[in-house]
Regions:
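Juxtamembrane transmembrane-helix termini
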Residues: 30-33, 67-70, 96-99, 122-129
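Mid-chain, well-packed structural core segment of small domains
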Residues: 63-99
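Physicochemical signature of membrane-embedded alpha-helices that form the seven-helix bundle of GPCRs
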Residues: 12, 78-81, 104, 111
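Membrane-embedded alpha-helical transmembrane segments of multi-pass integral membrane proteins
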Residues: 16, 20-23, 60, 82-89, ...
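Short, charged juxtamembrane terminal tails flanking transmembrane helices
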Residues: 1-3, 127-134
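Core segments of alpha-helical transmembrane spans in multipass integral membrane proteins
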Residues: 15-25, 42-66, 79-82
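Interfacial segments of alpha-helical transmembrane regions
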Residues: 3-17, 71-79
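Interfacial helix-loop-helix junctions of multi-pass membrane proteins
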Residues: 28-42, 89-110
Length: 134
């Protein structure tokens, strides 16, 4: 991941954070009286994991600037995929009640886990410094 790649993931994290706040506010104020308690809990779980993994995306971007690694891009992709599949499926499930969407949620959870493992590998693998120009 080059420095612009790190900045790209910081930008994506900013958009994700904005969306998490907006979706959370919509759930708390716009859906409060519409959703059942169970569906509201599903929605809130989606928002919570959306926030957690927005910070993970941000960490991938910042880490790249400090300690570059080819592993940070795949980790960030996994976190973003997890947000879309895990949180996104919970949002749609809560609003529409389509329970078949619940089958997508674990795939998003696996993407989150893959992101965390890849980030762990980044801490274990020695940094890959580009050759210095002479």
């Amino acid at each position: 991941m080059s420095r612009p790649q790190g900045n790209k993931w910081i930008g994506i994290a900013a958009v994700s954070g904005f969306c998490a706040v907006m979706i959370g506010a919509f759930g708390a104020h716009g859906l409060e009286s519409v959703l059942s308690e169970k569906m509201r809990a599903n929605f809130e779980t989606g928002v919570r994991y959306h926030f957690y993994h927005t910070f993970a995306l941000l960490a991938c971007g910042i880490l790249h600037v400090i300690h570059p690694s080819k592993l940070l891009e795949p980790a960030a992709i996994c976190f973003l995929t997890g947000v879309v599949l895990f949180s996104g499926s919970l949002y749609v499930l809560a609003i529409t009640g389509i329970t078949k969407l619940g089958m997508i949620t674990p795939i998003g959870g696996l993407a989150f886990l893959a992101g965390w493992i890849t980030l762990l590998l980044h801490t274990i693998k020695p940094p890959q410094h580009p050759a210095k120009e002479r």
